[in-house]
Amino acid sequence: KHSSARPLFIGQDIHRTVKFADPQNNLQHQLPAKMKLQRSLPTVQGSCQWYSAAILENPGNYSTLLEKDYHRYPALIPTSPFMDDKAPDKVKKLKMVWTADGPVLFWTAPKAKTEMDKAIQYVVYRFEKGEKANLNDASKIVAITRDTFIRLPYENGKVKYQYVVTALD
C-alpha cells in the first residue's frame, strides 16, 4: 500500500536480532519470529541484512540459520516492471560439449534491440530426464552466471539430466 508499487525489502539488524530473546520463546533469539512475520506479509518481497560484516561474524549462528533454514536456494533479483517490463529473448544454440575438463554447456546470448533488453545474467536449471521443467523451483538452479557457458557437474553418467538456461536483464 505504501511502497508506491515498488518492491519492498525490509532491513534486518543482525546484532539486535540475536541480542534479544523472542518474547514468545526466551530460549531463542528473534530471527525465527522475524522470518515468520516477514514471510507472512505479501507486500514484503525480501530483506537486507545490516551490517554486512556481521554476516561473516555469524553472531547467534545468524548466517548459518539463513543458509541452512531460510535461504537454502539461490534467489533471483526481482523484476522491476516499472523500469523495464520486457524480458530478454531466449538464449540460442544451447549445446553440451565434452572437454578435457568434462561436460560444458554453451549457449549464445540473445540479440537485444536496446541496452535495457540486453541479457546480463543467465540462470541454469537442471532437471532429471523426463521431469517437467518448473522454473519456479529454486532448488533446480545450478548456477546464476554472467558467462555464456558452465561446466556441468558429472556424476558417472548414472542419471541423465536436461538443462534449461534463461536470460535475465
What annotation goes with each model-predicted range?
Residues 1-82:
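Substrate-binding cleft of secreted/luminal carbohydrate-active enzymes
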Residues 2-5, 40-43, 98-99, 116-118, ...:
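A structural signal for short secondary-structure junctions
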Residues 21-22, 135-138:
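Short acidic, glycine/proline-rich loop/turn micro-motifs
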Residues 61-117, 157, 169:
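Pro/Thr/Ser/Gly-rich low-complexity, intrinsically disordered linker/stalk tracts
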Residues 110-136, 160:
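Solvent-exposed loop/turn segments flanking beta-strands in beta-repeat/beta-sandwich domains
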Residues 140-146:
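Short beta-strand segments within Ig-like beta-sandwich modules, predominantly Fibronectin type-III
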